[in-house]
Amino acid sequence: MALKPPSATQPAPNAPATPDAPPTTGDPGASAAPGSPTTTGGPGAPAEVPQEPQEPTQTPEELAFYAPNYLCLTIFAILLFPPFGLAALYFSYEGSWTQKPTSMLPPLQTMKANQNSEWEEAYINSGRTGWFGAFVVMIGLGIIYGLVLY
């Protein structure tokens, strides 16, 4: 029986894995260069490093449901009336008064809820941040207006 030549999709048995790689010999004890890591897969070879789990990707339909985070409005509220602006920043994520407040910024919490596809939480937090930020901006502008007039 005649031997068939290797097909175009199969590499030759002694061909290098890549065009730039040096040809390998059949001797598993020989190393390619001093100081280079061994990749023979033998018992003395280092274990492969496990890859980090990838974040789940979102479909275009899910990306369309992103809730706005009102980051500029929150920053504007802090600049116009810092006492309530900081309160808006701190308390806007709290669902009810029985929950303990968290120290993460509300716009960042909205972004995180958007990334985790927690739409209900993202929209509740987004609405709370927007309304409180708008309220604080109106108070700040009212105080400035009152100070300028009187």
UniProtKB/Swiss-Prot annotation:
Its main location: membrane. The keyword Transmembrane applies. Residues 13-22 have a biased composition (Pro residues). Residues 1-61 are annotated as: Disordered. InterPro entries: CD225/Dispanin_fam. Residues 1-12, 23-61 have a biased composition (Low complexity). The chain crosses the membrane at residues 71-91, 130-150. Belongs to the CD225/Dispanin family. This is Transmembrane protein PMIS2. It comes from Homo sapiens (Human).
